[in-house]
Each structure stands twice: as C-alpha cells, then as structure tokens.
C-alpha cells in the first residue's frame, strides 16, 4: 500500500473535503486554478473533476490514457520521461473534442484499461490499430 500512496489518500481526501466545506459551502469549485490549490489535487485529478463532475472541456492523463496516446501517436522512446509526459499532456489537450468530452475521456481510459493494456495489449481488437504507431513500428 505504501509505495502506491494508498496510505495517504484517505487523509488527503478528508483534508480536501474539509476545505471544500469551509471555503466553498461543501462544493468543489470547477476552475482549474482553484482545484490545483487543494493539497492532493494535481493536474490529472483537476482535469478529471472538471471533465466528469462538471462536464467541462478538460484534458486528463492517467496511466491508461498516457499508454494509449504514447502507443498510438508516438510508438518509441521513454513514455515516462518528463519531456514525453509534457508532450502527452499537450496531445491530450489537442485531441479533446469541443463536445462530449466526458465520453471521450472515459473512452480513452477504458481503451487503456481493457484493450491497450500494459502487458499483452489486444491490438487486433483495438479500434486504433490501423493508425497505431506502435503496431506499425513493431511489425
């Protein structure tokens, strides 16, 4: 539990909840800057809150989304490098549709969790396989 940060998450959630009650009447704000001011809320969580709770146009980049974007659009290199993460964030923001962002973000997360998995990805079942850089580079 400790290496994954699971031990601290409940405490951070309690702190965020207390701050939301004290300063915002129990409601989380929807603007990115304010969300990022909460200790324990980073770029991914702020984007997820804005996208899923408020249906706003906000990019997300969790492990699954990063894997999908890296494989489909990049294919080679170190997906965990700082420069690559910045590139993947920009890509995530660029690809956002103007409407149905909730569905788009959820679909990317699901694709990474169920098809474009870390080990033994199910490339033949992937709707992106025909344009996937990783598939093309590994043939």
Tell what function each PLM region has.
Residues 1-124, 128-138:
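Catalytic cores of DNA base-excision repair glycosylases
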